[in-house]
Amino acid sequence: ESGGSGEANGMWFGPRL
């Protein structure tokens, strides 16, 4: 998943998993 730093995904609030 493309998270990053608090992405709009609402799940990944860190590294790009």
Curated annotation (Swiss-Prot):
Protein name: Pyrokinin-5
Keywords from the named record: Amidation, Neuropeptide, Secreted
Keyword Secreted in record: yes
Parts forming coiled coils: none
Protein species of origin: Blattella germanica
Keyword flag Secreted: yes
InterPro entries: Pyrokinin_CS
Signal peptide: none
Organism domain of life: Eukaryota
A GO cellular-component term linked to this record: extracellular region
Compartment(s) of residence: Secreted
GO biological process, one term: neuropeptide signaling pathway
UniProt record similarity statement: Belongs to the pyrokinin family.
Leucine amide: residues carrying this PTM: L17
Function, as annotated: Myoactive.
Example of a GO MF term: neuropeptide hormone activity
